[in-house]
Amino acid sequence: MITLTDCSRRFQDKKKVVKAVRDVSLTIEKGEVVGILGENGAGKTTMLRMIASLLEPSQGVITVDGFDTVKQPAEVKQRIGVLFGGETGLYDRMTAKENLQYFGRLYGLNRHEIKARIEDLSKRFGMRDYMNRRVGGFSKGMRQKVAIARALIHDPDIILFDEPTTGLDITSSNIFREFIQQLKREQKTILFSSHIMEEVQALCDSVIMIHSGEVIYRGALESLYESERSEDLNYIFMSKLVRGIS
């Protein structure tokens, strides 16, 4: 379970203090799959980074399975797998297999556990044919698949994805969605931001909408369509579409 209590995060700009996340309080239950919606700069990634113990909140408390993200970061990171948009965390001079072996060791897996996890993940994501090739020569989509496998190498109970299907072709995106459905059946807790409405509808139990750092909606996507925030939802996805074709 993930709990945020009165959480804010401020950044010092050259001329002013920017409040990226504002007074957020919410709870995400075990096994819940939650989509995070919001325009660029709304605070989605900042909130995910705080949950992952990669950023400290300026105020408030965040706990992951009862562990404080500031006071007990090691315990938090052991329970969470993370993938942030544009940041694969991979080493270009190492092969895909070597990258996964390295991160497996960082998480304390033994040799047999690492081998089994790599075999499983490479099969699921169709990566067997290029596991022994250096990541530096991969396409964006291939790198993204290895990065997803890297986030899952230690079989975490909680997974945070920031636009996880960015760079993937349709086939790979569908494989990813099928894998998320399996993780749901395994009662994994998943948070991911996305600008793909079909993806959110297909995978999420509920959604969080963020605007200017504030959580302005938390609940079922179907109810959001009927709420006063439906215009905000249309803005988010239409603005993304316009940027994509301009």
UniProtKB/Swiss-Prot annotation:
Pfam families: ABC_tran. Its EC number is 7.2.2.4. InterPro entries: AAA+_ATPase, ABC_transporter-like_ATP-bd, ABC_transporter-like_CS, ABC_transporter_ATP-binding, P-loop_NTPase. Transmembrane segments: none annotated. One of its GO terms (molecular function) is ABC-type sodium transporter activity. Belongs to the ABC transporter superfamily. PANTHER family: ABC TRANSPORTER ATP-BINDING PROTEIN (PTHR42711), ABC TRANSPORTER ATP-BINDING PROTEIN NATA (PTHR42711:SF5). This is ABC transporter ATP-binding protein NatA. It comes from Bacillus subtilis (strain 168).
